[in-house]
């Protein structure tokens, strides 16, 4: 019975792809999980897979702080090494987060295969530093492969939750009407800037019959400042697969997880990269979609500027009163977005893992 240790921690962008791969593994595979205390995995993983938590952190500091972080890294690697030996783990799969570095080092220490999945177009710090110690580095976007040095990169795509691959019904709480549906996904990171940009569009769109669902993220002080029967604001939603499948247009950040979900849903999108993202990786992710005409990039700007408004009206105009139905770019954008997606990314990663043990 092959035993896999999944090392994934922190955000949904790390956890959901790892969960998709773990769920795709069939008997006789046995899966265990290692994560970090007080992170998202402590609520998502238990009940599905046995979870062990190990204290781990980043390596962003200097001087004494960095020395302490290095000591924590070695201690975490030792803890994971003991877990690997105790549970007789055969391979490690990691999607990043604070737990990735000690898991890679522990796997190397134990002499077992380790696969790292990098979902962004610009490899993250762990991939750049430790990718050479991995048996394989799987990448979600083809643009990342040439940027990975010292190891063999394999393009697999980024796995998404199963709900994105199944046809979903539009939630009943979505505004009803004949106008187009715009879905705005603020996200939990850097949502305020995007939210303020998009709210400047709402009055004119709503008065033209456009239906809007705005997922604001938490702690948005401006929620409720616009009230209209065609507008619904929510902090989050578990029904994003249905929203994206039925949306005529989305406005979203350009995180790798979000881009993968938009792609398999075939949703035409205006991408607004988070300007403070590490290494500006969201800009690079957005370029991958824009290069195939699946998305339009609008950089975050002051709400008083008109770039986002002009872009959205150009894309949705054919579906609004007075627009030219023959000048509708959305179908071609949706098709290009769907071609960017990889629906069987989880199976590609399963095949990769199985091949390393056979």
Curated annotation (Swiss-Prot):
GO terms for molecular function: UDP-N-acetyl-D-glucosamine:N-acetylmuramoyl-L-alanyl-D-glutamyl-meso-2,6-diaminopimelyl-D-alanyl-D-alanine-diphosphoundecaprenol 4-beta-N-acetylglucosaminlytransferase activity; undecaprenyldiphospho-muramoylpentapeptide beta-N-acetylglucosaminyltransferase activity. It is a peripheral membrane protein. Its EC number is 2.4.1.227. Keywords: Cell cycle, Cell division, Cell inner membrane, Cell membrane, Cell shape, Cell wall biogenesis/degradation, Glycosyltransferase, Membrane, Peptidoglycan synthesis, Transferase. GO terms for biological process: carbohydrate metabolic process; cell division; cell wall organization; lipid glycosylation; peptidoglycan biosynthetic process; regulation of cell shape. InterPro entries: GlcNAc_MurG, Glyco_trans_28_C, GlycoTrans_28_N. It is found in: Cell inner membrane. Gene3D superfamilies: Glycogen Phosphorylase B. GO terms for cellular component: plasma membrane. It catalyses: di-trans,octa-cis-undecaprenyl diphospho-N-acetyl-alpha-D-muramoyl-L-alanyl-D-glutamyl-meso-2,6-diaminopimeloyl-D-alanyl-D-alanine + UDP-N-acetyl-alpha-D-glucosamine = di-trans,octa-cis-undecaprenyl diphospho-[N-acetyl-alpha-D-glucosaminyl-(1->4)]-N-acetyl-alpha-D-muramoyl-L-alanyl-D-glutamyl-meso-2,6-diaminopimeloyl-D-alanyl-D-alanine + UDP + H(+). Pfam families: Glyco_tran_28_C, Glyco_transf_28. UDP-N-acetyl-alpha-D-glucosamine binds at residues 11-13, 120, 161, 188, 282. The keyword Flavoprotein does not apply. Pathway: Cell wall biogenesis; peptidoglycan biosynthesis. Cell wall formation. Catalyzes the transfer of a GlcNAc subunit on undecaprenyl-pyrophosphoryl-MurNAc-pentapeptide (lipid intermediate I) to form undecaprenyl-pyrophosphoryl-MurNAc-(pentapeptide)GlcNAc (lipid intermediate II). Belongs to the glycosyltransferase 28 family. MurG subfamily. This is UDP-N-acetylglucosamine--N-acetylmuramyl-(pentapeptide) pyrophosphoryl-undecaprenol N-acetylglucosamine transferase. It comes from Synechococcus sp. (strain CC9311). The lineage of its organism: Bacteria, Bacillati, Cyanobacteriota, Cyanophyceae, Synechococcales. The gene is murG.
């Amino acid at each position: 019975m092959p035993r896999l240790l999944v090392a994934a921690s922190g955000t949904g962008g790390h956890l959901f792809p790892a969960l998709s791969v773990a769920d795709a593994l069939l008997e006789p595979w046995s899966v265990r999980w290692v994560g970090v205390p007080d992170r998202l995995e402590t609520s998502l993983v238990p009940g599905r897979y046995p979870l062990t938590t190990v204290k781990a952190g980043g390596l962003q500091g200097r001087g004494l702080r960095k020395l302490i972080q290095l000591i924590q890294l070695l201690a975490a690697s030792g803890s994971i090494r003991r877990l690997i030996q105790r549970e007789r783990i055969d391979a490690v799969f990691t999607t990043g987060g604070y737990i990735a570095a000690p898991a890679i080092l522990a796997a190397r220490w134990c002499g077992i295969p380790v696969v790292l999945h990098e979902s962004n177009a610009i490899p993250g710090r762990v991939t750049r530093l430790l990718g050479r110690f991995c048996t394989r580095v799987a990448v979600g976007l083809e643009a990342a492969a040439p940027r990975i040095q010292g190891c063999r990169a394999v393009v697999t795509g980024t796995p998404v939750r199963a709900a994105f691959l199944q046809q979903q019904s539009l939630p009943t709480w979505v505004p009803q009407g004949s106008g187009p549906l715009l879905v705005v996904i603020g996200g939990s990171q850097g949502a305020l800037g995007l939210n303020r940009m998009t709210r400047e569009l709402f009055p004119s769109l709503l008065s033209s019959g456009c239906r809007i669902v705005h997922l604001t993220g938490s702690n948005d002080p401006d929620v409720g400042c616009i009230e209209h029967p065609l507008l619904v604001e929510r902090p989050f939603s578990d029904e994003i697969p249905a929203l994206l499948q039925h949306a005529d247009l989305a406005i979203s950040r350009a995180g790798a997880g979000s881009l993968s979900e938009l792609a398999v849903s075939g949703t035409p999108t205006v991408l607004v990269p988070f300007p403070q993202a590490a290494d500006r990786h969201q800009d690079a992710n957005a370029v991958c979609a824009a290069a195939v005409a699946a998305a339009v990039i609008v950089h975050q700007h002051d709400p008083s500027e008109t770039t986002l408004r002009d872009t959205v009206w150009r894309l949705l105009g054919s579906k609004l009163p007075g627009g030219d139905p023959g000048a509708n770019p959305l179908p071609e954008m949706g098709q290009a977005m769907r071609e960017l997606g990889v629906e069987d990314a989880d199976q590609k990663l399963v095949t990769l893992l199985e091949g390393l043990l056979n």
